Amino acid sequence: MEEEVTDDEYRAALEALQSTISGKTRAAPKGPHDLTWEQQFDRLHVYLDRLGMTESVNAMSYIHVAGTKGKGSTCAFVDTVLRRSGTRTGLYTSPHLVDIRERYRVDGAPVSKTTFTRNFWWLHHKLKETCEADLGMPAYFRFLTLLGFRIFTSMNVDAVVLEVGLGGRLDATNVIRSPAVCGVTSLGLDHVEVLGDTVGKIAREKAGIFKPNCPAITSPQVPEAMESLELRASEVSGCELTVARPLRDWRTVGGVPLVLGLAGKHQELNAALAIELMRVWCGRVSPASCPWGASALSDLATGTLPEKWVVGLAETEWFGRAQVVPDDVEDLSWFLDGAHTEESMRHVAEWFCGHDGLGQSQSQSQNQITEPVRLLLFNCMEERDPEMLLTPLAQTAEAMNAPITAPALFTPSESSSKGLVPFAGVQDVTWQGKVARTWDELARRHAGCVRASEQQVVGEVPTGVPTGVPTGVPTSSLSLSSLAASAVVPCLRQAVESVRRRAREERALGSGRRVHVLVTGSLYLVGDMLRVLGRAG
């Protein structure tokens, strides 16, 4: 039995990995020695050859998924159902929320520190030996992708569920040559500085994962995106593109209710795509890899979902997406979702505003429930448009008569794409001040989206705590029941303690109202929140 690595050995691997983070974006080369993104992508094939991994990597069976929204959820549905059916799976996703090992799951669980560390150093030493002199070391995400291939080939998985990191055409995951099936989730505007400024251009990049003689399945798309997908499929020999059958069109054995483990109406699109991807996968792999495939295909041919698929769809979990975490403080719940696109924020707003005072969806609630106190804890990355993200929340809260109780809190994330260790020092909150002012303006436009705290004395704002601007108020003096609109809090833990104080105040009043807090805008913020709450992994 292999000796387990120590925590120090694991940390040493993370420190070495940290050195591969360049912070570069897919921009035009700035100097004569800089490579284009296309050239960097082409080098992945050379890396695989020199590592001696080309044959083993291309021998694995892949379900490859690109898209703007719902990639991770779709992959989670696929992974859970395949495992429930008896298939040994490898799941590669990004980004991670708390621990880098979340990106590599085998049979549903993140790989061990020992597995990660041993494979990391094998890859690192091999690249140093064979590639560094003339090619250099691959950058962060490319290194992580090569590491995923190494881990999954060494652990003999039957299927690899592969989520694209960014775009598709030039993404590191696209180095594979013959996936069993490709999927495209809902498309929208995101990473426009890299992928293009129209949905059609973005769709073209996503469709870059289409391969010869490989079926492609897509969720329903807007016409402009669909045209781009169809055009690209027509250019690839033997690539047949179809739209996933709606979830409502599938029957279940005995008519049992079809319940999804992931909350939100939009998850029906992701589950429907997952079903089609698995159906195609079953028909294209060998019986040895999928001994249950013939039986499943027989059921599916009649429009009936196999029983284990129904169970798997209901059991699917995906941390940081539509996740409700009860706090240790009674009557306080955190609603976590890393939404960071306009449409995703609208889905999250509907999910959050649609919960009653018991934390149930209104459709589940049978009795009259005291309306909860709804709070907002938000951050987004500086390349995002805060107005575009916050507008759907303001509109939905107003339309559903589910106002956000003031103040909304804006705090920087401790984690970022630039490092593996959360930042523990004092951060510049100028950006959060700008985002807070955006919310204040939206609150003026959509009067019904915000509710003043019932405990607030009108006009009473603590000295040094102007609304919507950066502040460094000590935790002991920040009381949510005395602030007027938005507030910038320089530390996430301080924000958490302030919310907990608000929940205790509600309880002391005997109002019977639960406190619901929506934490959204960034997967990094959500990951930090899980860490603070002790819910990592």
Give the ranges of each region predicted by the language model.
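Active-site-proximal loop/hinge segments that shape catalytic or ion-binding/gating pockets
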Residues: S522
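ATP-dependent carboxylate-amine ligase catalytic core
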Residues: A28-W37, D49-R50, T54-M60, R84-R177, ...
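Short glycine/serine- and small hydrophobic-enriched flexible loop segments
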Residues: L147-T153, I275-G283, R531
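Short acidic-hydrophobic, aromatic-tinged amphipathic segments that line or gate anion-handling sites
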Residues: T242, A436-T438, A484-S498
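Nucleotide phosphate-binding/pyrophosphate-handling subdomain across enzymes
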Residues: A159-V160, A172-G183, L187-G188, K201, ...
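Active-site beta-alpha connecting loops in nucleotide-dependent enzymes
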Residues: S219-A225, W318, A339-G464, G468, ...
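Conserved catalytic-core segment of NTP-binding enzymes
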Residues: L166-V236, L375, E387-M388
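Short functional linear segments
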Residues: M1-G67, S73-T87, L91-Y92, E132-L135
